């Protein structure tokens, strides 16, 4: 993937950059692996907003992604690399030798015609999935299971990867993208390689409308609201808010620690992010 600059034919195009999509090999998804996606607009089942600044955006079909990679011992061929509007990564359509089709996250270096395998006997090459017990120390991995058999939950966005740095008993030690070093069960599966579309972080949207296409609505500052809506709201004319920055519910922001000190997973974190 490379990034393409647009000609400055309008203010919105002047600083806008887009992907050249050269890695994409088809224009329509596999129909049997898609279904319609209903707009949630940040609401829960009661209709209350639980995720602010969501709504609108282009229509999407959801692609069913195989995060579990449980088809052990059956090789598959990469039929095509596709765009997925529901995630930053690209996806790869696999045709298994028994006739089944599945989508997986497309890692760096994968291409049409490659053979992908799952299981303890799989080679250490991008796209192959196997338990971390059988992955060499130092390997870059993604789509990592926290609970064996539940499916990959870590390192799934564009360019993401963790590094397997050690094994201690039943645990594997991973260096996460944040710099945190944590333990996960080594019997859990992971996929070899780094998630593709690595230049996604360098894309400039260029204009507000492009955010709206993605279903993102404007973010209103607390000091611009009324006192009923935010602790920093109100005042005659422009004001500083009169207190340290807080969320709409009064929780301090700007570095305030919100993690529960008694959280069970804390014992699995060997080194916090940001620590030297």
Curated annotation (Swiss-Prot):
<dbReference type="InterPro" id="IPR022669">
    <property type="entry name" value="Ribosomal_uL2_C"/>
</dbReference>
<comment type="similarity">
    <text>Belongs to the universal ribosomal protein uL2 family.</text>
</comment>
<comment type="subunit">
    <text>Part of the 50S ribosomal subunit. Forms a bridge to the 30S subunit in the 70S ribosome.</text>
</comment>
<dbReference type="InterPro" id="IPR002171">
    <property type="entry name" value="Ribosomal_uL2"/>
</dbReference>
<keyword id="KW-0699">rRNA-binding</keyword>
<dbReference type="InterPro" id="IPR022671">
    <property type="entry name" value="Ribosomal_uL2_CS"/>
</dbReference>
<keyword id="KW-0689">Ribosomal protein</keyword>
<feature type="compositionally biased region" description="Basic residues">
    <location>
        <begin position="259"/>
        <end position="276"/>
    </location>
</feature>
<dbReference type="GO" id="GO:0002181">
    <property type="term" value="P:cytoplasmic translation"/>
</dbReference>
<dbReference type="GO" id="GO:0003735">
    <property type="term" value="F:structural constituent of ribosome"/>
</dbReference>
<dbReference type="InterPro" id="IPR008991">
    <property type="entry name" value="Translation_prot_SH3-like_sf"/>
</dbReference>
<dbReference type="InterPro" id="IPR014722">
    <property type="entry name" value="Rib_uL2_dom2"/>
</dbReference>
<dbReference type="InterPro" id="IPR012340">
    <property type="entry name" value="NA-bd_OB-fold"/>
</dbReference>
<dbReference type="InterPro" id="IPR005880">
    <property type="entry name" value="Ribosomal_uL2_bac/org-type"/>
</dbReference>
<dbReference type="Pfam" id="PF00181">
    <property type="entry name" value="Ribosomal_L2"/>
</dbReference>
<dbReference type="GO" id="GO:0016740">
    <property type="term" value="F:transferase activity"/>
</dbReference>
<comment type="function">
    <text>One of the primary rRNA binding proteins. Required for association of the 30S and 50S subunits to form the 70S ribosome, for tRNA binding and peptide bond formation. It has been suggested to have peptidyltransferase activity; this is somewhat controversial. Makes several contacts with the 16S rRNA in the 70S ribosome.</text>
</comment>
<keyword id="KW-0687">Ribonucleoprotein</keyword>
<dbReference type="InterPro" id="IPR014726">
    <property type="entry name" value="Ribosomal_uL2_dom3"/>
</dbReference>
<dbReference type="Pfam" id="PF03947">
    <property type="entry name" value="Ribosomal_L2_C"/>
</dbReference>
<dbReference type="InterPro" id="IPR022666">
    <property type="entry name" value="Ribosomal_uL2_RNA-bd_dom"/>
</dbReference>
<dbReference type="GO" id="GO:0015934">
    <property type="term" value="C:large ribosomal subunit"/>
</dbReference>
<keyword id="KW-0694">RNA-binding</keyword>
<dbReference type="GO" id="GO:0019843">
    <property type="term" value="F:rRNA binding"/>
</dbReference>
<feature type="region of interest" description="Disordered">
    <location>
        <begin position="223"/>
        <end position="276"/>
    </location>
</feature>
<protein>
    <recommendedName>
        <fullName>Large ribosomal subunit protein uL2</fullName>
    </recommendedName>
</protein>
């Amino acid at each position: 993937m490379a990034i393409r600059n647009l000609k400055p034919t309008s203010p919105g195009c002047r600083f806008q950059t887009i992907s050249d999509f050269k890695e994409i090999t088809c224009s329509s998804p596999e129909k049997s692996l898609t279904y319609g996606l209903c707009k949630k607009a940040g609401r829960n089942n009661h209709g209350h907003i639980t995720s602010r600044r969501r709504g609108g955006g282009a229509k999407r079909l959801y692609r069913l992604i195989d995060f579990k990679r449980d088809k052990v011992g059956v090789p598959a061929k990469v039929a095509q690399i596709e765009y997925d509007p529901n995630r930053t990564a690209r996806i790869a359509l696999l045709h298994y030798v028994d006739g089944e089709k599945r989508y997986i996250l497309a890692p760096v270096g994968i291409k049409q015609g490659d053979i992908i395998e799952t299981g303890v006997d799989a080679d250490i090459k991008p796209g192959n999935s196997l338990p971390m017990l059988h992955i060499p120390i130092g390997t870059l991995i993604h789509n990592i299971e926290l609970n064996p058999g539940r499916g990959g939950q870590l390192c799934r966005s564009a360019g993401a990867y963790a590094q397997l740095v050690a094994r201690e008993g039943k645990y594997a030690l991973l260096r996460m993208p944040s710099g945190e070093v944590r333990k996960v069960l080594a019997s859990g599966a992971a996929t070899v390689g780094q998630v593709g579309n690595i230049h996604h972080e360098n894309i400039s949207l260029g204009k507000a409308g492009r955010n709206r296409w993605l279903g993102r609505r404007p973010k209103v500052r607390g000091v611009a609201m009324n006192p009923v809506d935010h602790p920093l709201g109100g005042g005659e004319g422009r004001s500083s808010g009169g207190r340290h920055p807080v969320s709409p519910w009064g929780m301090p922001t700007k570095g305030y620690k919100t993690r529960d000190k008694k959280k069970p997973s804390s014992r699995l974190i060997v080194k916090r992010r940001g620590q030297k």
